[in-house]
């Protein structure tokens, strides 16, 4: 093989990435039309299609490379030269960071995730950090309130590319101004101007306007979820201006945004200012670049593990029957390994568990299911594993371990955001915090069900609490589609003795679920039971679940809000929410600074 072959292979990989990202942008660009046409099922299909594109194009490139090399063996020096040639193609390449991740994916597919060394892969980027200061097209546009905030917001909304009429633009502008005045006060608002992203961020049934409230000493998020009414008219549902609210909107438990980003790195840097608590991995994940987010997540792990003296330990909480979960005490992620053998009541295979995790990756997570990154042949230093955990790994997942002396290799694991297990949280809180947690738990189940997901095992231990107090589901081995479940009432006992029998007096088929039985484990705690009955008693009735099933089967797609319903303009300013009525801010026109 000649030296020219290395360049040909490098060019083939980069061209394959160009094709993949071109299709990625093509699918993304259809988001506006899907929104305008209210084609919500197409929204869901496009989300899955875009996720599958990456692996599909990696496979195409792998087949091309096998043809190019004609099945000849490739030694280490040859592979290093290919990477060197690829590196030389990247200095002027606009998406170099994701192109490196694509190279890694091709290599892993070719060599079955083995020999994953920094010499052969882009474990760390080969390129210096690039500030995106000169762009072929600006990412955002500035708006100044010289003629008042009403005029400014009118210009912002009129500049949107959406081709639908507004339900009542003047009313929505009044709502936004009132919300800004409540959040900032008139004097501070008078010192602000807006910077608004040129592209809308589409997700579920909303088109998000994402911007920045730029003040002399700080910058805040400015987020407007724009919805489409059943009559085909646009309206703004709320205005979010805090970092915590923005963090939830861009959260790890939500589906990826559809936002047209030819330069994703530049968009990530632009977003960082209003999402200071998000890591680089989380920002790439939010805009749909999930494979590069995996690369960045691994880099964040390496950065942490090389600078700490902690040891891996079993994660807090009740030990799972399917997954073995461990963590580093100060790290914000957990590592999940499928056990070799499951508890007897778990009649499933490892392949089934992996399929469930893939379902979650592709499905609308509605802010209630944690995203995961999947890794193969993950290497750990033994000195950084607590002896008790190492013994547990060897006992429970020994078939997935390869002992390399001072290191072990785990053939397959998931990395997921670390949360406080809900059962531990409920033990620690009282009063309003307890009430909020129970309300969140029930809301999580409702929203999952509305998205056609039945959690299966709804024990508190299978849910976690985020730093924002949201309850998120994270145990996926028993999930299924709502439409696959048969929700039944428990038949009345035939005789008084039936209720005392160890076996049910009625037949139970696969897929049967009896919501009345939820009460036994959800309401057993006297601190929790009355709260659950007060707020979520309908979850204990089979007819509630069947009604949801019917809505799903009839094609209804529920609205998903990344904020509390009490923040919706229709709730906050409900008396003035009629389409034919404009809204006047409480304090009238905002004063302009001199």
Curated annotation (Swiss-Prot):
The keyword Protein biosynthesis does not apply. It comes from Klebsiella pneumoniae subsp. pneumoniae (strain ATCC 700721 / MGH 78578). Bifunctional enzyme which can phosphorylate or dephosphorylate isocitrate dehydrogenase (IDH) on a specific serine residue. This is a regulatory mechanism which enables bacteria to bypass the Krebs cycle via the glyoxylate shunt in response to the source of carbon. When bacteria are grown on glucose, IDH is fully active and unphosphorylated, but when grown on acetate or ethanol, the activity of IDH declines drastically concomitant with its phosphorylation. The gene is aceK. Its main location: cytoplasm. Belongs to the AceK family. GO terms for molecular function: [isocitrate dehydrogenase (NADP+)] kinase activity; AMP binding; ATP binding; phosphoprotein phosphatase activity; protein serine/threonine kinase activity. It holds the Pfam family AceK_regulatory. The active site is at residue 371. It comes from the Bacteria. Its EC number is 2.7.11.5, 3.1.3.-. InterPro entries: AceK_kinase, AceK_regulatory, Isocitrate_DH_AceK. ATP binds at residues 315-321, 336. This is Isocitrate dehydrogenase kinase/phosphatase. PANTHER family: ISOCITRATE DEHYDROGENASE KINASE_PHOSPHATASE, PTHR39559. Keywords: ATP-binding, Cytoplasm, Glyoxylate bypass, Hydrolase, Kinase, Nucleotide-binding, Protein phosphatase, Serine/threonine-protein kinase, Transferase, Tricarboxylic acid cycle. GO terms for cellular component: cytoplasm. It catalyses: L-seryl-[isocitrate dehydrogenase] + ATP = O-phospho-L-seryl-[isocitrate dehydrogenase] + ADP + H(+). It is found in: Cytoplasm. GO terms for biological process: glucose metabolic process; glyoxylate cycle; tricarboxylic acid cycle. The keyword GTP-binding does not apply.
């Amino acid at each position: 093989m000649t030296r020219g072959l290395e360049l040909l292979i490098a060019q083939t990989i980069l061209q394959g990435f160009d094709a993949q990202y071109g299709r990625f942008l093509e699918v993304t660009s259809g988001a506006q039309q899907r929104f305008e046409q209210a084609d919500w099922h197409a929204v869901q299909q496009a989300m899955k299609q875009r996720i599958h594109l990456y692996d599909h194009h990696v496979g195409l490139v792998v087949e091309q490379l096998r043809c190019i090399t004609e099945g000849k063996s490739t030694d280490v020096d040859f592979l290093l030269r290919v990477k060197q040639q690829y590196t030389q193609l990247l200095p002027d390449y606009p998406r170099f960071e994701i192109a490196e991740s694509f190279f890694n994916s091709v290599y892993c597919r070719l060599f079955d995730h083995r020999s994953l060394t920094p010499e052969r892969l882009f474990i760390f980027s080969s390129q210096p950090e690039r500030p995106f200061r000169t762009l072929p097209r600006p990412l955002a546009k500035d708006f100044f309130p010289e003629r008042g905030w009403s005029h400014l917001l009118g210009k912002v909304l009129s500049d949107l590319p959406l081709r639908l009429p507004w339900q009542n633009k003047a009313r929505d502008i009044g709502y936004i101004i009132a919300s800004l005045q409540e959040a900032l006060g008139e004097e501070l608002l008078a010192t602000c101007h807006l910077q608004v992203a040129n592209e809308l961020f589409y997700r579920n049934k909303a088109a998000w306007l994402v911007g920045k409230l730029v003040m002399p000493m700080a910058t805040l998020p400015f987020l407007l979820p724009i919805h489409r009414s059943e009559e085909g008219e646009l309206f703004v549902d709320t205005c979010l201006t805090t970092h915590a609210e923005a963090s939830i909107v861009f959260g790890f438990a939500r589906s990826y945004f559809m936002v047209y980003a030819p330069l994703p790195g530049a968009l990530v840097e632009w977003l960082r200012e209003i999402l200071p608590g998000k890591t680089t991995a989380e920002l790439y994940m939010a805009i749909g670049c999930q494979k590069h987010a995996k690369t960045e997540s691994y880099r964040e792990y390496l950065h942490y593990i090389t600078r700490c003296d902690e040891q891996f330990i079993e994660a807090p909480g009740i030990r799972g029957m399917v997954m073995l979960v461990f963590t580093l005490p100060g790290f914000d992620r957990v590592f999940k390994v499928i056990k070799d053998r499951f508890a007897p009541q778990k009649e499933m295979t490892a392949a089934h568990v992996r399929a469930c995790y893939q379902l979650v990756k592709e499905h609308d997570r509605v802010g209630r299911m944690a995203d995961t990154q999947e890794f193969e042949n993950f290497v750990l230093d033994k000195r950084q594993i607590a002896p008790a955990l190492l013994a547990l790994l060897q006992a429970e997942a020994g078939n997935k371990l390869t002992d390399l002396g001072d290191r072990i290799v785990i053939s397959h694991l998931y990395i997921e955001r670390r949360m406080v297990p809900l059962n531990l949280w409920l033990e620690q809180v009282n009063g309003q915090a307890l009430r909020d947690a129970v309300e969140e738990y029930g809301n999580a189940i409702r929203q999952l069900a509305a998205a056609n997901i039945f959690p299966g095992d709804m024990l508190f231990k299978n849910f976690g609490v985020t730093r924002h107090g949201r309850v998120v589901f994270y145990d996926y081995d028993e999930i299924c589609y709502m439409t696959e479940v048969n929700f039944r009432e428990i038949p009345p006992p035939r005789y008084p003795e039936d209720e005392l029998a160890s076996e049910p007096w009625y037949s139970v088929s696969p897929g049967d679920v009896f919501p009345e039985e939820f009460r036994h484990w959800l309401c057993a705690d006297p601190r929790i039971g009355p709260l659950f009955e007060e707020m979520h008693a309908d979850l204990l009735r089979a007819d509630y679940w069947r009604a949801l099933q019917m809505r799903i089967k009839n094609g209804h797609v529920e609205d998903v809000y990344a904020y509390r319903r009490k923040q919706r303009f229709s709730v906050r300013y409900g008396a003035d929410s009629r389409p034919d009525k404009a809204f006047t801010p409480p304090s009238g026109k905002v004063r302009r600074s001199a």
